Design a protein with these regions (language model features):
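Hydrophobic, small-residue-rich transmembrane alpha-helices and their short perimembrane loops
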Residues: 1-102, 116, 121-122, 156
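Alpha-helical membrane segments in multi-pass integral membrane proteins
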Residues: 119-126, 149
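Juxtamembrane boundary at the C-terminal end of a transmembrane helix
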Residues: 161-171
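Single-residue recognition of alpha-helix boundary sites
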Residues: 33-34, 67, 74-75, 107, ...
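Membrane interface segments of multi-pass transport proteins and intramembrane proteases
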Residues: 108-114
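Structural signal for membrane-spanning alpha-helices in multi-pass inner-membrane proteins
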Residues: 103, 107, 130-135, 160
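Interfacial loop-to-transmembrane junctions
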Residues: 129-155
Length: 171
């Protein structure tokens, strides 16, 4: 029984860690890329990114907890097993905050045009590494999973850049 509980804890942890980290990286770098390319001042880019991270981390953490809780209620009614809702929410929140700051860091130290390149490059590298880590934890193909996660993140960045270019407020 203890082994089953450990597997459930591990499953909740992996699911929420990967989801929070991937969603935070993709959302944050997509948003920052879009507003940076639109000519937004660097201080606004940083402020927007930080607000996004904490609002989304809380939202995702709560959504994870509520989702896990609903699943737990269903499983109890159908005698499927136990889940740990609060753990999932906490892991989601923490991974979202930690990984969300990765795309912001370049904007703290360099001007916006260079920061945009660094932010996108670093985020894509981290997405690839996260895909590989996720594949390793789940026992699937490392390279394939890394590439898929990188391509999906790249698509979000492209959307942010396209919208930011279209709405360009800087001139």
């Amino acid at each position: 029984m203890a082994e089953v509980q450990k597997q459930k804890l591990t499953s909740v942890f992996i699911r929420n860690f990967v989801f929070g980290a991937e969603d935070s990286l993709v959302s944050t770098v997509g948003l920052l890329s879009g507003i940076a390319i639109a000519g937004t001042p660097r201080s606004y880019i940083v402020l927007t990114g930080i607000v996004l991270i904490f609002v989304e981390a809380f939202s995702m953490g709560v959504a994870s907890e509520l989702s896990e809780h609903s699943t737990e209620e269903y499983e109890q009614r159908h005698e499927v097993g136990e889940r740990i809702p609060m753990l999932g929410g906490l892991v989601m929140f923490v991974s979202y905050v930690v990984f969300g700051f990765i795309p912001i860091i370049p904007y703290l130290f360099t001007e916006s045009a260079a920061a945009l390149r660094y932010s996108v490059s670093i985020s894509l590298i981290v997405l690839f590494a996260l895909g590989v880590l996720s594949a390793r934890l789940s026992g699937t193909k490392l390279l394939r999973h890394g590439i898929v996660m990188t391509v999906m993140g790249g698509a979000a960045i492209a959307i942010g850049v396209a919208i930011g270019s279209f709405i360009n407020i800087g001139g």
